[in-house]
Amino acid sequence: MAMRIRLSFERPEGSGLCIMVDLLRASATITAALDRFREVIPVADIEEAMEYSRKGYLVAGERGGETLPGFIANSPLEVKNYRGDVLVLTTSNGTRILESVKSDALVGCLNNLDAVAEAARELSDEVEVVMAGVNGRFAIEDFLCAGEIIAAIDGEMDEYAEASVLAVQDRSLVDDAIRRSRSAERLGGLGFMDDVEYCIKRNITGNVPVYRDGRIELMEEIRRLH
């Protein structure tokens, strides 16, 4: 049976395996963090994140791209400077999307492009890529990242998914569009342009983060335990 792939915005609309895409920067931060931490706990609420911090957990968090006081940045480059058992993460968009997912979900970005596509093919014949967007608005960087993931999975696509694949035929244009996106411009203004360049890198890791029961672990770790 051919893979069936659909693309949606902010929340899953079907019952297939979800891949959450928040290119700038939650997806990349989570993927990088799992090199240094056993698991990531995503929380949507700042107060809940602060409670974790008071209990001694390391917390990464931002709103509107700005790092929250007392937390480390939602940055794939910054999390590489830390190591531990658990990282708590709260972000403007990606963590909120994960909390709305009712079943298991993968976390996808360009850094783990082929790895997450291969995992999706292995786990299900029905996949839904969910774009996080920015505060309820369409984000071109998520659309383009989704297109590359969907192209790598390769299957029967709904029209939205097909449009995203058609949009990523020229990789140099994709990269330019991501760099010129509202999100990238804001991050650049806050001093995080290195993060943007990092998030554009493709296939630099085989990490496949899996969100399950409120926590994110590597797929290989879940396999080992189950």
UniProtKB/Swiss-Prot annotation:
Keyword Hydrolase: yes
GO BP terms in the entry: coenzyme M biosynthetic process
Keywords (A to Z) from UniProt: Coenzyme M biosynthesis, Hydrolase, Magnesium
MF term (GO), any: sulfopyruvate decarboxylase activity
Catalytic activity: (2R)-O-phospho-3-sulfolactate + H2O = (2R)-3-sulfolactate + phosphate
Top-rank lineage group of the source organism: Archaea
Pfam families: 2-ph_phosp (PF04029)
Keyword Hydrolase: yes
Cofactor field: Mg(2+)
EC number of the protein: 3.1.3.71
Biological or metabolic pathway of the protein: Cofactor biosynthesis; coenzyme M biosynthesis; sulfoacetaldehyde from phosphoenolpyruvate and sulfite: step 2/4
Family: Belongs to the ComB family.
NCBIfam families with a match to the protein in the record: 2-phosphosulfolactate phosphatase
Protein name, per record: 2-phosphosulfolactate phosphatase
Originating organism: Methanothermobacter thermautotrophicus (strain ATCC 29096 / DSM 1053 / JCM 10044 / NBRC 100330 / Delta H) (Methanobacterium thermoautotrophicum)
Organism classification: Archaea, Methanobacteriati, Methanobacteriota, Methanomada group, Methanobacteria
